[in-house]
């Protein structure tokens, strides 16, 4: 008996854009909101979801292409109280500089500044999303905002795509992190990107 209200950014199957509707789900049940258009401009970034009990939300795009590859990307998003106003994003290994970062505002009059080899500032309204390629001379992007924003990175290796929600800088994680390389990856290159302050580099 979880009540969930959805305001889709664009038209979805069975519901029009910007018109709230409510669904009821029991434990273990799921609901899929699917955009009526395959064009990225009309997908669902910036949609609003509220619930009276805890829920999990996964966002996906089932077919992104960089010739000759095609992949599904997605991640489980976090609630607004877990996002932040400061991010660092490191460029991956996609071919032809196809790495991108997407910023979504949660409040009106959100001022966002991107720092790479140069800086760029812009305003976003609530639910508005803007995407950026990395500047050709920079492998990192430092992002600040005056109000909480979501940051989603599209990256990968060669033409193999992946995507994930980027945690804000205040989400410092832990001092020790373990991970296991998959069996299928043993014949492929494995890359681990780590960022820190300049003062820590010589330690």
Predicted regions and their residues:
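Extracellular lectin-like interaction modules
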Residues: 1-203
């Amino acid at each position: 008996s979880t009540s969930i209200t959805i305001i889709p950014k664009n038209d979805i199957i069975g519901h029009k854009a910007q018109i709230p509707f409510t669904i009821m789900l029991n434990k273990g049940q799921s609901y899929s909101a699917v955009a009526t258009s395959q064009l990225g401009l009309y997908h669902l970034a910036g949609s609003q979801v509220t619930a009276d009990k805890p829920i999990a939300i996964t966002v996906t795009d089932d077919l992104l292409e960089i010739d000759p590859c095609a992949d599904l990307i997605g991640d489980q998003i976090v609630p607004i109280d877990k996002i932040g106003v400061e991010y660092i994003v490191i460029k991956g290994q996609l071919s032809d500089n196809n790495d991108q970062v997407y910023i979504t505002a949660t409040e009106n009059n959100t001022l966002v500044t991107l720092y790479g080899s140069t800086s760029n500032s812009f305003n976003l309204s609530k639910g508005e999303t803007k995407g950026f390629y990395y500047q050709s001379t920079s492998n990192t992007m430092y992002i600040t905002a005056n109000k909480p924003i979501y940051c989603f990175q599209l990256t990968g290796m060669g033409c193999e795509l992946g995507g994930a929600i980027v945690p804000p800088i205040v989400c410092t994680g832990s001092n020790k992190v373990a991970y296991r390389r998959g069996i299928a990856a043993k014949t492929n290159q494995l890359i681990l990107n780590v960022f820190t302050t300049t003062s820590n580099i010589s330690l």
